[in-house]
Structures are given as C-alpha cells and as structure tokens.
C-alpha cells in the first residue's frame, strides 16, 4: 500500500491579510531620473557588477602621514559622493565609504572631455562611484585625490537631505535608517560599536569555554520571563505558536542534557509598551553555568561589562546626560530590603499592609492594588522609590519569592529567593539567579503564576510541564544571567533612547 503525501502548502494561494501595510509610493527625483536616462543613452551601465579597490579610504588617509614618500601615489577606491562643488573646469567633492571621507578633485585636463562632461552634468551627491587617482594636498593643506579615472557604480534616484540642515527629524531617521546612516557618520559609529560589543561578548565567553547555542523562537509554550507574548498560527501544524519572550527554559534544558556552560545571544519579543528603554523586539544574552550560584553570576556579569567597557572605550567612565558613570570594579552590592532602607528610609516589614498601601498612594506609585503581601510591596516600593537613584553600577540582590518564579529559594532568608538585578543609570541592565532546580517546587511556582494569569495578570507565566519533566531528570546547581544588549549599547554610547541603538525600531504605521 502506498501512502500519498500532500506537500501542498495551504498558505500558498492565500491572499494577503487586510492589515498588511502596502502603503507608500516611490520618492524618486525627476532630475535624477532624467540624468539616469542620459547615462543610459551614452551606452553606460548605471549599475555595474563589481569594482576592484586597492584600499579603503581610511587606509588612503594613513598614507598622508608620510606625504613626502607617498605624494603622487596611485590609489583605487570607491564610495558615495557628497557635497559636490563645481568651479568651472574643476569639481571638488567628498568621497565617503564605511571607513571615512576624503576630498576628490575632478579636473578637466585630467579626464577626457566626454568623461568630464558626464561627471559635471550627470553625477549627483548620493551617487556611488569608483575612482583611480593620485594623492596630493591642496594649497590649504587638505588631503585629496586627483582623479584620473572614474566609474559610476550606482546611480542614486533619491535626493539626499540638504547639506547644512541634514537629516534632523527623529521620526524620519528611525523610519529611514538607511538614509540616517548615509548622511550621519556618527550614527553609523553607534552600530559599529554595537557590532564590536557583541563580538567582544562572544570572545569573553569563548575564552571561558562557554558554548553558544540557538534555541527556538517559535514556541508552543512561552516562558522564562513575566511578559505578554506575541501569538501566531502555524498553518501546516494547525496550532498556535508564540514568539519567545526569553530563551531561559530551553537553555536550562541544555544544562540538564549535560552542557555545563551555555549561552545564547537572542532576539526576544514582548508585546509590551514602547518607551525610551523598551522595544517589543530586543536583543539579550543569557548565560548559564552548572555548579555556580547567583554570587558567581554577579562576579561574571561585573567582569564581563567592565572588560567590555574598557576594550571599547579605553576607560571605565561613560557619560549619560549629566551623570558620569564609573564602571571600574568593585561595584556596589546591596539587598533589595537594604536598598529601600538606605535610599528611601523605609523598612517594609515594620509596617502593616494597609500602611504600605498608604505609602504607595502618597508616593503616587501605580499598581499598588496588585500587592497582596509584604514581599510584593517590597518589590513595588523599590521600583517606585529607589530604582532611578541607582546611577553607578549597583547589584540589588535577594528578591521576594512572589515575583521570581524561576529562582531558587534563599538558603537562609525565608520568603526570599537568590536573585539579583544590576542597575545602571536608573535602568535594569541584567538579571540573574541561583536557578530553581527542584521540579516539585517549580511546578508549585508555575501553578501560582497560572492562577495569577487566570485572574487577569497578562504577564504571568504559564505552566510548562515539559520543562518540569526536564528538571525531573536532574538539573545540577546552576547560576544564570540575562543581560540586555540594547541597553548596554545605550550606556556605552551615552544615549537615552533605545531607538538610537536598534537599526530598525518598531514604529507605528503611518496613516
């Protein structure tokens, strides 16, 4: 008997959903389109396939350090044209690539008349060209290249922003990041730093024999954090799936499986508010190490960030607005209970629940109705009265058990768990635990979370029985840590908005 397999994808012939955004129109410049036609009419290809360079612009600029030796040296490079200045038989322009900018001179006597006319009449700022020429300095001492050959590599059809005003509108910069990167070199440097930051994290952990893994983004059960998920539907499987809110539960499954040092740099998705420190799609790293606890993970977090800051900035101080933040070790460590006493003069456990409610109301702290215990008021009042005062790096440790369903019970303090958060510039930057590895206790915690969810807490976690069963095979004592890449980049770059460090942040659809 032969079984027929249906490989037809039911989504193949489905129309696009009504809410897919297909709005917009092309924004090509009429004069640039006319120049494109002029280029084609000359038999030139406005979009050729490749160009051979013998150096980037930064490498060429270095040669000017020994100008006596390198004057007249022939170079071949490529980049985008900026700020074209025409002076009769001479045309100056800036040529920019990823590494820098240099002035180029197109002189009528150095090019055939037809080529000079082509450049003068048909090239624009924004075009990408390849050049060959010789190094020289102008009478004013500006390092330059005298062009003897040029090739159009890509004709731009959209006009760049006007030189002196540039691209200043924040909304436009976020929606058209490609344009932001073209005209704002300092914005490109932010993302160069971000790329180097991620590379340095990988190097730091690889040096300590951690292994990098990839875990599912589409999950049948979401978990690992208290957050609202994004929901989708898989047509072939006929079931709901969720975009991951954290990789935690899968990484701990790997530790159960025998990997003792694991990490993942992951894209996570949380269906939450958007503000200066939150984006629904964000990047973080989670690290787990067997036979370690939350004290070890605080040590690892401090060593990692201190080394990153020094390697990327050359020092330990970063500027955030009016604050200068010192990231040199050692960092302050204080319990949540102790921090509330130190920064707000408040001892939660010396007050009744009604008194704590009134304190919350007096300080205009929202969501006080959700607090039903001293532990929940401790977390609530800490967030409202202390967090924004933690400018220099500070580890807050020992959290109430009520809001930490994945952390191990404290070895000495009843009602608390071995959890820490790292605060910097008033922001939470990292979070870590001595990981809960008792499957019966984990099941109990999940069930308590599920009760909250059914009562309307949309950020409460669900029961993941497969994870509970994984713990049933034995998770060794384990320390874990999660660190926000976006916020760390903000700190290193001295920026106050998360949208400045995400290349394509989520934006509301334009009407």
UniProtKB/Swiss-Prot annotation:
Its cofactor is Mg(2+). Keywords: Aminoacyl-tRNA synthetase, ATP-binding, Cytoplasm, Ligase, Magnesium, Metal-binding, Nucleotide-binding, Protein biosynthesis. Residues 1-21 are annotated as: Disordered. Binds 3 Mg(2+) ions per subunit. It comes from the Archaea. One of its GO terms (molecular function) is tRNA binding. It is found in: Cytoplasm. Coiled coil: none annotated. Residues 1-11 have a biased composition (Polar residues). Signal peptide: none annotated. Mg(2+) 2 binds at residue 428. InterPro entries: Aa-tRNA-synt_II (IPR004364), aa-tRNA-synth_II (IPR006195), aa-tRNA-synth_II/BPL/LPL (IPR045864), Lys-tRNA-ligase_II (IPR002313), Lys-tRNA-ligase_II_N (IPR044136), Lys-tRNA-synth_II_C (IPR018149), NA-bd_OB-fold (IPR012340), NA-bd_OB_tRNA (IPR004365). Its main location: cytoplasm. Transmembrane segments: none annotated. Its EC number is 6.1.1.6. Mg(2+) 1 binds at residues 421, 428. GO terms for cellular component: cytoplasm. It catalyses: tRNA(Lys) + L-lysine + ATP = L-lysyl-tRNA(Lys) + AMP + diphosphate. The keyword Zinc does not apply. Homodimer. Belongs to the class-II aminoacyl-tRNA synthetase family. This is Lysine--tRNA ligase 2. It comes from Methanosarcina acetivorans (strain ATCC 35395 / DSM 2834 / JCM 12185 / C2A).
């Amino acid at each position: 008997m032969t079984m027929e397999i249906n490989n037809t994808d039911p989504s193949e012939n489905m129309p696009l959903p009504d809410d897919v955004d297909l709005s917009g129109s092309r924004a090509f410049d009429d004069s640039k389109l006319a120049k494109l036609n002029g280029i084609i009419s000359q038999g030139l290809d406005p979009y050729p396939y490749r160009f051979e360079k013998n150096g980037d612009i930064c490498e060429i600029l270095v040669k000017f350090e020994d100008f006596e030796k390198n004057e007249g040296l022939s170079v071949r490079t490529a980049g985008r044209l900026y700020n074209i200045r025409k002076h009769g038989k001479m045309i100056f322009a800036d040529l920019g690539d990823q590494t820098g900018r240099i002035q180029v001179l197109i002189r009528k006597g150095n090019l055939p008349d037809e080529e000079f006319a082509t450049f003068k009449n048909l090239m624009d700022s924004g075009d990408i060209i390849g050049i060959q020429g010789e190094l020289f300095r102008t009478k004013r001492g500006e390092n330059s290249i005298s062009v003897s050959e040029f090739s159009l590599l890509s004709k731009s059809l959209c006009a760049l922003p006007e030189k002196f005003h540039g691209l200043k509108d924040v909304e436009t910069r976020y929606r058209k990041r490609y344009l932001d990167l073209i005209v704002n070199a300092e914005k490109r440097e932010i993302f160069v730093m971000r790329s180097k930051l991620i590379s340095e994290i990988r190097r730091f952990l690889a040096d300590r024999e951690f292994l990098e893994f990839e875990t599912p983004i589409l999950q049948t059960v979401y978990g690992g954090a208290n957050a609202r998920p994004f929901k989708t539907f898989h047509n072939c499987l006929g079931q709901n799936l969720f975009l991951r809110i954290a990789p935690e539960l899968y990484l701990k499954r790997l530790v159960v499986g025998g990997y003792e040092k694991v990490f993942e740099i992951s894209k996570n998705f949380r269906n939450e508010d958007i503000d200066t420190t939150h984006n629904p799609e964000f990047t973080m790293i989670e690290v787990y190490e067997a036979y370690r606890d939350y004290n070890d993970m605080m040590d690892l977090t401090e060593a990692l960030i201190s080394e990153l800051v020094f390697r990327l900035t050359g020092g330990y101080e970063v500027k955030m607005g009016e604050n200068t933040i010192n990231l040199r070790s050692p960092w302050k460590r204080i319990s949540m209970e102790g921090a509330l006493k130190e920064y707000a003069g408040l001892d939660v456990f010396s007050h009744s629940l009604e008194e704590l409610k009134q304190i919350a109301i007096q300080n205009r702290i929202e969501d006080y109705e959700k607090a039903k215990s001293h532990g929940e008021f401790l977390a609530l009042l800490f967030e409202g009265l202390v967090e924004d005062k933690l400018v220099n790096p500070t580890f807050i440790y020992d959290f109430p058990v009520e809001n930490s369903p994945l952390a191990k019970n404290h070895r000495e303090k009843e009602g608390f768990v071995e959890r820490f958060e790292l605060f910097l510039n008033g922001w939470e930057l990292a979070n870590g635990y001595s990981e809960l590895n008792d499957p019966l206790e984990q099941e109990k915690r999940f069930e308590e979370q599920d009760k909250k969810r059914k009562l309307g807490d949309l950020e409460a976690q669900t029961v993941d029985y497969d994870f509970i069963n994984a713990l049933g095979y034995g998770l060794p004592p384990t320390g874990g840590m999660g660190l926000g890449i976006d916020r760390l980049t903000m700190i290193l770059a001295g920026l106050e908005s998360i949208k400045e460090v995400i290349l394509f942040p989520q934006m509301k659809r334009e009407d």
